[in-house]
């Protein structure tokens, strides 16, 4: 897995190693050991999936302590432009944003 930092601390682009041939492809979308070694120690407690029709804009979602949680976002079909905005008061990147294309072709994931 290749880990790419973004302009916002704690927001990372993850690029898995994809193994493909004429049958299709395979990649490890998550490994607790690799994640702990390259990103941070985390316990994922929830897994969600959503479907959006073409042209849909999803809202900005966030949680405040004590309900804050990290998210690992990926796309299995099509593509999205995922935008993360730093709304943490006191953060040196407060108000800044990063935009990342996530798609079935690039297999990128965004850790927020």
Model region roles, listed by residue range:
Residues 1-108:
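Non-catalytic, conserved peripheral segments adjacent to functional cores
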């Amino acid at each position: 897995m290749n880990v790419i930092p973004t302009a916002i601390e704690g927001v990372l682009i993850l690029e898995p190693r994809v193994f493909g041939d004429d049958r299709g492809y395979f990649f490890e979308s998550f490994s607790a050991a690799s994640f702990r070694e390259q990103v941070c120690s985390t316990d994922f407690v929830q897994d969600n999936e959503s479907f959006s029709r073409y042209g849909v804009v999803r809202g900005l979602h966030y949680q405040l302590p004590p309900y804050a949680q990290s998210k690992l976002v990926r796309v299995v079909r099509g593509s999205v432009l995922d935008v993360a905005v730093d709304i943490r008061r006191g953060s040196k990147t407060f108000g800044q944003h990063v935009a990342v294309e996530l798609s079935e072709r690039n297999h990128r994931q965004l850790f927020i």
